[in-house]
Amino acid sequence: MALKVAIVGLPNVGKSTLFNALTQTAAAQAANFPFCTIEPNVGDVAVPEPRLDKLAAIIPSKEIIPARINFVDVAGLVRGASKGEGLGNQFLANIRDTDAVAFVTRCFIDDDVTHVEGKVDPLADLETIETELMLADLESLEKRVANLEKRAKTGDKESAQTLRLVNLALTELNAGRPARKAKVAAEDEKAWRMLQLLTSKPALYVSNVDEASAATGNEMSNLVAQRAKRDGADHVVISAQIESEIAMLDPAERTEFLETLGLTEPGLNKLIREAYHLLGLQTYFTVGPKEARAWTIHKGDTAPQAAGVIHTDFEKGFIRAETIAYDDYVRLKGEAGAREAGKFRQEGKEYVVQDGDVMNFRFNV
């Protein structure tokens, strides 16, 4: 399940520095000038999962395979991007191809790092980005209305549904609100996603702070947190510069460095988990002598759907899922203990998988 999160923001806010740290490479050219990221950089990132290590230790498993999520570093946006200013058209197309958006805002003062607007104001940065995305959505939708109306009048049900959703989105956008604020019925969600609206994607606000503010945040990041709450977005505080330094250290040095900063873990771990949560994802595990593995599914997925993530044959020929809750598996030290304690369950097709379930699937094709 290769889901993508776009890392977006104005030039010189720390997007590429953050991306470099996420991928532990210098693939994104982090430079102090606009548009240093011209082609989108895609990084395949492991989702931090302490539970997986504990499960692997019980068996023990030879290999540990975490869940993964993709981050995309795209070119810095400038005012007028919706009209093609800067690298606007390319920027917008790159976002359209992702599942969620992480808005990176600059929450630090540094005279050596220029700001494209001439001053540091994270809320103004958010307004600029959101406005450009809303304008792009408005233009995209308005172009479709006349054709959809014509086709809907012929009795085309699909066009009628799309037209209804287009008008729903236009109502929000014309009121100055992103499309994600619209209330979409469950039966319309697939058609809604097909609109590929930039402002309908789940949003994560990332406050990029200086080293001194990495543990507690600062006045600017507090303002961003308040805006995130108002906008229904998630929020995380991180110091991209610190994270880039941490990424180059070995595990022992990393722990010591974090302690000196008053941190218990890298900020990137929080960012990755927030992105995972933002996409409505959860994890189940398969465990054996060969490997312990985390699998990514959507919240609410049934056992057959979870099996299908491993292989489509597992879903097509699903018979049952042998299931143990994570806490029971660890507390009872594996499958044998869970069986003895009556915590080993046989679940059928209607079972909704819970986060952390340890599963084995029986199927026939």
What are these regions (language model features)?
Residues 35, 49-52, 65-71, 85-99, ...:
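Amphipathic alpha-helical transducer elements in NTP-driven molecular machines
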Residues 1-114, 142-143, 148:
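Conserved G1/Walker A P-loop phosphate-binding module
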Residues 22, 84-87, 116-119, 218-222, ...:
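Short, glycine/charged-enriched secondary-structure capping and boundary segments
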Residues 6, 35, 40-43, 50-52, ...:
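Short capping/connector residues at structural and topological boundaries
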Residues 25-33, 40-42, 47-50, 54, ...:
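Residue-level signal for pocket-adjacent positions within structured domains
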Residues 2-8, 13, 19, 147-354, ...:
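C-terminal-of-GTPase-core extension/linker across diverse P-loop GTPases
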Residues 43-48, 75-85, 96-157, 172-185, ...:
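Conserved Switch II/interswitch segment of TRAFAC-class P-loop GTPases
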